[in-house]
């Protein structure tokens, strides 16, 4: 069989040309620019072949993915690598190894939104509002909340070094990580008729724990409730909805509105007559905590007491990708029953009262907010 070299070469050129045209059109569509493909090639060549030190292809590709989601300019939308994705799943399950601290980001950088009671960070003396300037000697100036959380978590028994800035002073902490199974619900009777429930996070198991402890307090004579959501960073909307069924009569809990304007209304379905209620909040109360507080305030079901909340009024979902990675992306904003959007604003309490510095929330001896809640419920 005789091959015509020119015919073979021409066929190859047609296939290659067709491939280039398809790629060019694809990147034109993806980038919105006719020059999308060459722009990518120039950037990739500069990073992989010209940059002063060699960089792996995997690092460059991960950077592209993180940059893609980061370009949304919304702090809660991030591409999660394998470690970050694992950390996220552990956080919502309520079980992980770390120091028991929830992080956030403000105009000064990375900071502690809330410190979980009786966990390593709490015992070491880290306080809500502390800015974390270094983790294991590495600056936090250019890392995301998810990156920082992943670095702080690790094997139980290992030590993480944190450099903290507090009121202009730099402090150093060496904290031993522990396996943390979060007791997300704690309760007790404050008086013969007033119960107290503290929720530290709305995790997968929180609703069941809340139900058990709520019914136990009822059996002890609870007729009114102090619900403590201070330093609660939020969690699962499904858990929030279940808990609302114990403290709110039938009605709107929250409305979630997506980019297309579609509205999903979540409702509470509790007793027709609500139990007298005071909800404690502070700057560390975010997301699901604000859903509860906002609904109670709008529907006049109780009194919100404390300081202005964090102001996270958005809903995220996680899309798993291959290789145990994923994308956490903000899909909607939530509206309180009176159609308030609190993202970036927070909820202003009905009764504003701050804790003195150095007082741990839920300490009934020194906690003036709990004392004020009791005063409100007993009048």
Stretch-by-stretch model annotation:
Residues 51-111, 159-161, 165-174, 182-184:
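Extended, small/polar residue-biased N-terminal targeting/export presequences
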Residues 4, 26-28, 32, 111-114, ...:
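Cleft-lining beta-strand/loop regions that shape enzyme active-site pockets
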Residues 323, 327-333:
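Short acidic, Pro/Gly- and aromatic-enriched capping/linker segments at domain boundaries
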Residues 46, 132-133, 160, 342:
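Generic structural signal for buried aliphatic residues
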Residues 2-76:
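Terminal targeting/pro-maturation regions of precursor/exported proteins
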Residues 71, 342, 361-364, 368-379:
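Conserved functional hotspot residues or short segments at active or partner-binding sites
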Residues 65, 98, 102-116, 193-198, ...:
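PDZ/PDZ-like groove recognition
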């Amino acid at each position: 069989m005789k091959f015509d070299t020119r015919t073979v070469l021409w066929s190859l050129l047609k296939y290659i040309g067709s491939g280039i045209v398809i790629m060019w059109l694809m990147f034109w569509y993806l980038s919105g620019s006719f020059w999308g493909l060459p722009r990518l090639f120039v950037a990739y060549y500069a990073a992989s072949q010209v940059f002063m030190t060699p960089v792996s292809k995997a690092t460059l590709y991960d950077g592209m993915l993180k940059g893609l989601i980061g370009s949304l300019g919304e702090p809660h939308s991030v591409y999660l690598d394998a470690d970050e994705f694992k950390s996220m799943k552990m956080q919502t399950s309520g079980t992980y190894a770390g120091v028991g601290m929830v992080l956030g980001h403000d105009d000064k950088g990375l900071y502690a939104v809330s410190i979980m009671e009786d966990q390593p960070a709490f015992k070491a003396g880290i306080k809500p509002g502390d800015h974390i300037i270094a983790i294991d000697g590495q600056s936090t100036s250019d890392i995301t909340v998810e990156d920082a959380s992943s670095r702080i978590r690790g094997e139980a028994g290992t030590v993480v070094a944190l450099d903290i800035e507090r009121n202009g002073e730099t402090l150093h902490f060496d904290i031993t990580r522990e396996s943390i199974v979060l007791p997300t619900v704690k309760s007790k009777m404050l008086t013969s008729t007033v119960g107290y429930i503290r929720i530290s996070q709305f995790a997968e198991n929180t609703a069941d724990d809340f139900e058990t402890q709520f019914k136990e307090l009822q059996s002890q004579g609870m007729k009114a409730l102090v619900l403590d959501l201070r330093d609660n960073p939020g969690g699962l909307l499904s858990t929030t909805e279940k808990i609302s069924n114990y403290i709110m009569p039938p009605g709107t809990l929250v409305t979630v509105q997506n980019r297309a304007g579609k509205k999903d209304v979540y409702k509470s379905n509790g007793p027709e007559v609500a139990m007298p209620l005071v909800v404690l909040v502070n700057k560390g109360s975010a997301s699901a905590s604000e859903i509860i507080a906002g609904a109670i305030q709008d529907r006049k079901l109780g009194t919100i007491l404390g300081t202005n909340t964090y102001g996270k009024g958005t809903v995220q979902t996680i899309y798993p990708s291959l290789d145990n990675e994923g994308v956490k992306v903000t899909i909607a904003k939530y509206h309180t029953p009176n159609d308030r959007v609190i993202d970036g604003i927070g909820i202003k309490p009905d009764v504003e009262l701050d804790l003195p510095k150095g007082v741990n929330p839920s300490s009934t001896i020194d906690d003036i907010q709990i004392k004020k809640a009791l005063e409100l419920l007993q009048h």
